């Protein structure tokens, strides 16, 4: 006897909205109006410690649209959400997290399709899994992050001694993507995704780390599980959906040519992100008490991600533009430009010997 769990496009978008709402709650400092511990980094302009007055209206519109979209997933409500989210991300690029991008794409795919929605969503999830696995085929994941995940539990710590297992996990994740788009899918394969994401969630809970992505993992497992059920949506994605799938499935390749953002390239737990460190001979009061709690090198250096995660619950958005913004913002802490600088660390995903740093003086960041 075969057991199926069919679900409509309305049900799928409700899963996405629930996941998005939970992620936003776990990163409330990133979204709420008012003063910010970590500044906004807008697409245009400089870093700011306040969200601005009219942002309150945008935030209220977003919350209302999410609620209405969940209650009655009609296109007139769903269309607003990707637009509002992208505007809010433009006002602070830190909001453009991988999970934000994923939910924007899911909602936009549902809003632009009818019978083709299930097919398009399968291809979207396939892109995330395939790129998520492919980006992990590096020593930074197999030698470091995989070992860290294994060491969360004493009983599995020994597995981290075998980098080959890390590469195996990466390949398995890619296989999960392929299974979603095979012509003869088996409904029980959906349990593979539930198991995969459950292990990630359990590890994050045990490590007391990165809680904000737990709802994303839960939503992805639910979407994948239900998308293995038979449906009537066998139509090819329409032009709008094809464009969205192009962004999800092909643009991550452009990251390796410095033409696409790290956060939008499904670099999930790869440990290959660029890092910004601010150096100051004296504590910077713009960071509040985070400098005292998180600084190192005798209190002279602060990893900017530590500050962002402490205040917002997420890492900062990585780009030359945002690094310069945060550098200028922190340089205002000291009147002596010779006592402060921004240090950027870049890695080559496949060559650990190729790490290099770029140092900007505050004078250069002007």
Which residue stretches match the model-derived regions?
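Alpha-helical membrane-anchoring segments
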Residues: 1-366
């Amino acid at each position: 006897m075969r057991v199926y769990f069919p679900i409509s496009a309305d049900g799928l978008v409700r899963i996405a909205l629930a996941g998005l709402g939970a992620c936003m709650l776990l990163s409330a400092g990133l979204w709420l109006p008012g003063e910010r511990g970590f500044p906004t980094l807008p697409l245009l302009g400089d870093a700011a410690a306040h969200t601005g007055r009219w942002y309150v209206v945008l935030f209220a519109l977003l919350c209302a649209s999410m609620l209405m979209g969940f209650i009655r997933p009609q296109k007139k409500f769903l269309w607003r959400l990707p637009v509002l989210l992208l505007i809010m991300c433009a006002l602070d690029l830190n909001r453009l997290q991988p999970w934000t991008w994923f939910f924007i794409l899911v909602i936009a795919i549902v809003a632009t399709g009818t019978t083709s929605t299930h097919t398009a969503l399968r291809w979207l999830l396939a892109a995330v899994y395939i790129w998520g696995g492919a980006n992990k085929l590096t020593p930074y994941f197999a030698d470091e992050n995989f070992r860290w995940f294994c060491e969360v539990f004493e009983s599995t710590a020994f597995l981290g001694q075998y980098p080959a297992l890390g590469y195996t996990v990466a390949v398995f994740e890619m296989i999960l993507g392929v299974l979603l788009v095979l012509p003869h899918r088996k409904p029980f394969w959906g349990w593979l995704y539930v198991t995969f994401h459950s292990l990630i969630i359990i590890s994050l809970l045990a490590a007391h780390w990165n809680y904000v992505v737990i709802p994303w993992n839960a939503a992805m497992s639910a979407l994948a599980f239900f998308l293995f059920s038979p449906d009537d949506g066998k139509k090819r994605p329409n032009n709008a959906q094809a464009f969205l799938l192009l962004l999800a499935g092909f643009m991550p390749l452009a990251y390796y040519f410095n033409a696409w953002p790290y956060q939008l390239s499904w670099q999930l737990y790869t440990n290959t992100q660029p890092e910004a460190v601010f150096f100051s001979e004296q504590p910077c009061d713009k960071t509040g008490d985070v400098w005292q709690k998180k600084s190192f090198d005798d209190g002279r250096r602060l990893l900017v991600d530590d500050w962002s995660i402490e205040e917002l619950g997420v890492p900062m958005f990585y780009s030359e533009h945002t690094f310069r913004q945060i550098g200028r913002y922190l340089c205002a802490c000291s009147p002596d430009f010779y006592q402060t600088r921004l240090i950027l660390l870049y890695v080559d995903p496949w060559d650990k010997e190729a790490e290099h740093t770029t140092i900007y003086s505050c004078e250069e960041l002007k």
